Amino acid sequence: MCGIVSIFNIQEQTPELRQQALRMSQKIRHRGPDWSGIYCGGSAILAHERLSIVDPESGRQPLFAPDKKQVLAVNGEIYNHQNIRARFAGKYQYQTGSDCEVILSLYREMRADSDFDTLIYKGEDALHARISKMLEELNGIFAFALYDAERDEFLIARDPIGVIPLYIGYDKDGKVLVASELKALEGQCDHYEPFLPGHYYYSKNPGMKRYYTRDWFEYAAMQKKYQIDDKKKAEAQLKDAEPQEKAAVKEIHDALEASVKRQLMSDVPYGVLLSGGLDSSVISAVAEKFSSTRVENGGETKAYWPRLHSFAVGLKGAPDLAKARLVADHIGTVHHEINYTIQEGLDAIRDVIYFIETYDVTTVRASTPMYLLARVIRSMGIKMVLSGEGADEVFGGYLYFHKAPDAKAFHEETVRKLGKLYLYDCLRANKSLAAWGIEGRVPFLDKEFLDVAMGMNPVLKMCPDKTIEKKVVREAFADLLPEEVAWRQKEQFSDGVGYSWIDTLKQITASAVSDEQMAHAAERFPINPPQNKEEYYYRSIFAEHFPSDSAAKSVPSVPSVACSTAEALVWDASFKNQNDPSGRAVAGVHEQAYK
């Protein structure tokens, strides 16, 4: 994981502006503690804080084209970089072994087209199609800023789902600023906001524009493809789709295996986050399968590190820890169980909110143990981990999905959840780990895997009544896991580290925030007024760190049950008067639901 800061549309380069960029970059140095770099030229400044994962020796950034006419700052990993390099053999002289350098070659190819300049004047559609084509060639997680010094133009882009964070801001002088975390922009801009996933910003046609589009964004395409009978209820739809299940299981198995294998590229020690739930257990088991050799050369040489290390965190006696140990013993990882106390968690919350830059209740709850775990992982020399984020959004794994009335409601909710993931679990996983200089990779959100998983018949993902959630994933990988884990009910990470963690947070915040404060919450916080005392408590800390309106607007604040969107609250009458993100809020489904 790295950190980037860039300033564009500079009218005059000055020593003061360079120092401003350096100060901004220093605020995110935790993301990239291995090296710092900066470029100042033309109308741009690009600064970079590096965490070296691939090509530690020569991959320092910013990266330059062979003739120095283009410069690039990237936070991310391009998993198909070897294929792109092969395509440019003899046509582009790469300067480093960095996977991210392929972005420069793709940009140069695009810009070298004889008709590209005319596209700028032909109309937005033609220009948009050409830039989108370039960005679609990348399979990876990324946020980048590219400056073309020859033409004095720039291109900014973010990965399809928003695994890598990025923010964009504008100052009173017309400058455009981007940074990996909002703390670098706080106080520097008149306005800033999250840079949207799957979008780009091209200076010759300003504004964020979506390049990542898929047929599965719309349920109508899925309904037509699979001839789903929308007149039927969930149970009947599921019965109709049963003949397709076997093929779907194999497709998911093969696609996820390929995703994990792609994401194991690394020149430094790596591990896996193993919570003991289904998703992290599947990722860990598949990673263990390929970890003994280097995926970069097709498994022809042994891995630099002989054993895969797995990590779990929780309070003593937490439900996840025993299951994580069981999985680790089953698949053969070197397992590390990290215990923390409730007081240690409470003491960390102020720092956690500073690093993750949110006041969302679920995110703060889950980020705290992850933040504590990341510190231990880094102390052991691990710089990259694979994690299971995204599976619940893709496959409808949250317990409230049991209440989905039909395939249309189910599929549209998964699309909504994926579209908002950059504000929640992607943010948590990235920033909690990056606080200690660790990169997190998420195979369930791999672009090629998503085309398979989101393109499958949504009926096969449904879990009406007592049907177990994520059945297709369980069947695809049951042979790699202990049976009691393969068929274990979904447990949210913030619950699984220990129920007493959540219960104590509720008690502490309930006593720390008075009824009078809650009554006047909208006066103190007119933007997204806190909906409960726990959110008020976190919001107060957030406002101390980041007092601007832009910061407040960057965080979502919507009613939710068990991590649902607001739209899904109509699925069950019991959701109507609830606002609790815990899975225990789904009565009749969670085995230890609230009484």
Predicted regions and their residues:
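Short, motif-level signal for alpha-helix interfacial/capping segments enriched in acidic residues
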Residues: 9-12, 367, 422-427
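ATP-dependent adenylate-handling ligase core
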Residues: 249, 316-374, 400-409, 431-432, ...
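Short, charged, surface-exposed loops that flank catalytic or proteolytic processing sites
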Residues: 115, 131, 364, 462-471
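Short, well-ordered loop/turn and helix-capping segments at boundaries between secondary-structure elements
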Residues: 10, 90, 109, 289, ...
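Generic recognition of stable, solvent-exposed alpha-helical segments in well-folded globular domains
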Residues: 19, 98, 247, 251, ...
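Adenosyl-5′-phosphate
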Residues: 1, 234-237, 379-386, 405, ...
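Short acidic/histidine-rich active-site segments
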Residues: 382-392, 398
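Cysteine-centered catalytic environments shared across enzyme families
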Residues: 1-358
